[in-house]
Amino acid sequence: MKNKFLATLFLACSISTVSAQTPVYMDDAQPIEARVKDALSRMTLEEKVALCHAQSKFSSAGVPRLGIPELWMSDGPHGVRAEINWNDWGYANWTNDSITAFPALTCLAATWNPDMSAKYGKAIGEEARYREKDVLLGPGVNIYRTPMNGRNFEYMGEDPYLASVMCVPYIQELQKNGVAACVKHYALNNQELWRGHIDVNLSDRALHEIYLPAFKAAVEEGGAWSIMGAYNKIRGQHACHNDFTLNKILKDDWKFDGCVITDWGGAHDTYEAAVNGLDIEMGSYTNGLTSESVFTYNDYYLASPYLQMLKDGKVPMSTIDDKASRILRLIFRTAMNRQKPYGSVATEEHYAAAREIGNEGIVLLKNAPVVKKGAPLLPIDAAKYQNILVVGDNAVRLLNQGGGSSELKVKDMVSPLDGLRAAYGDKVAYAKGYAAGRPMYGRADEIPQNVVDSLRAEAVEMAKKADLVVLVGGLNKNHFQDCEGGDRLEYGLPFGQDELIEALLGVNKNLVLVLLSGNAVEMPWVSRVPAIVQGWYLGSMGGKSLADILSGAVNPSGKLPFSFPAKLTDCGAHAFDELSYPGDSIKQEYKEDILVGYRWHDTKKIPALFPFGHGLSYTTFTYGKPVASAKAMAADGTLTVTVAVKNTGSIAGKEIVQLYVGDDKCSVLRPVKELKHFAKVGLAPGEEKSVTFTLTPDDLKFYDEASAAWKYEPGKFKAYVCASSADVRGVVSFEMQ
């Protein structure tokens, strides 16, 4: 008994001694700030600097001497990219890095449903965690300024409020997995052409009202742990080390406590990188290393050159302590977070999430009868149509491939053709119809004319015998389409699709057009195509989502997150000279100012072909007369707007009720109206619900350049209850005191 007592006493003392010897920075029970301070105090200058730059293509160093691990990053934002080689862009060809491809963020934004954003963030976070990633490079929240931008498919549309609301749940749920969101590309990376050096100039109003709100929401509401700088310059200084946007706005005004990470190759100057707010430098020189004998990671701007400047007193020591503190904070939140879950990949839950997001994001643009007074063409009645012809390269193309850094290696991919065959069986035949080339980066295949002609002729012959034709076309992830590193060359459909559509209409009027893209396209045939569906890039379960909508198994409820101009010059960015878009290759001016998207269409009275917020359903909805809670709002008060919405059709559906606000008279130019609130409401047939929105004085403010502050001017305002930006269902006037 005595020996047992002594052993127990010895064990207790040993545990106590070990506990007492545990450094603060290694103690999970300690606050993160205490751990950061303790770790920093133990580090040498060289160890601090080593944190600030890459050690491989997708990792940055830890502090091995102190047991602090490295940070591992991965491209996103709609799937975890396959493993990349240590020193180059080649794939490592692992056998266990296949994942779920989730719908692109344009599709997520088109759901207008924050619950879908949360579901998305949770699922992609679990996959990133399973793949042992600490930082996921996403979501992207750059504003849709022009339909020519090759990277719009990665973003959340043209409206800053919609993008703000939709990015926050994604970030919050992602980070619950111990994986940092790296919100990108901060800021004004609104085109791919000349992205590495184009110098963007714009008003402070446009910056604060249009281009920054989603980033601000990501930081202040979403609690994002990292931000990725953009490639472009802003007012003469590169965005990855821009004093105004990083130090003044992000870190001082928004109190951001996370890390600023370059886009790969986005750093250009050691002094600016040291003092202007950059924390981690990735991918410098040729966007990485040409070979280890030519460049080493120690040659990066924030590596040996920075260390030498610190030793020479050319930059303050406070800069490295701030950077190292932020990086340590990120490491404690992610790589050293022992409470994080294990994660999972390509699960049935993730596939279900991808399918549901796709179902809610697909937008029914048009659904007309083929014959006068007949029924709309969609949904496709299996009993009515015995011979369904599916046409189009996009019906079978793997759209997870190409696109640049968002390219994904999937475990499963259901194509549109597969999805439609699962729904309609042997009634479905297929013709390619057009050729689109390979998904190469930096160049595009040239398709021989004889191939174009033969594929079109085959499709037309088969269409003559079909009861109904479903053309699955649009853009793809090839260069000069929806792809990083270059912008589109034309607003119209590529690969001869306009001619194909005309030819198919010439032999079969029962034509359903499905557009898979992340951008608007010109539609010279729009009045003659009875049914048009915007299908986005839908990911692993895309074919099932598309079949769900086309068959009527799911009622479409998505609405557009950006406007479809009838022609390119109807878009504000393209209504001026080339200095507005694409710039003169050196400089660029955002001449449309705050009038982006529907703000331009409304204010200039230029109707969009399909307006922001537009989307049809297989049922119908009626709106009652909106009622305000008061005739005036006090400076410290609120005002509610309530409207009844009823499903007057025969099937259940979801309607997205939108509330916009307009200022009747102001000393500065303001848009006719701006989106301030929305709600997605599910209604059974015949069901009616009341939807209430609460307005505050903040909803009425504009950014005043003279005072560099948000303000409103007392006076008369209008609240517009809308089914889209162009479909106003009711207006309420009120006064702001």
Where are the regions that the model predicts?
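Short beta-strand elements
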Residues: 727-737
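Glycoside hydrolase catalytic-domain context in secreted enzymes
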Residues: 17-702, 709-726
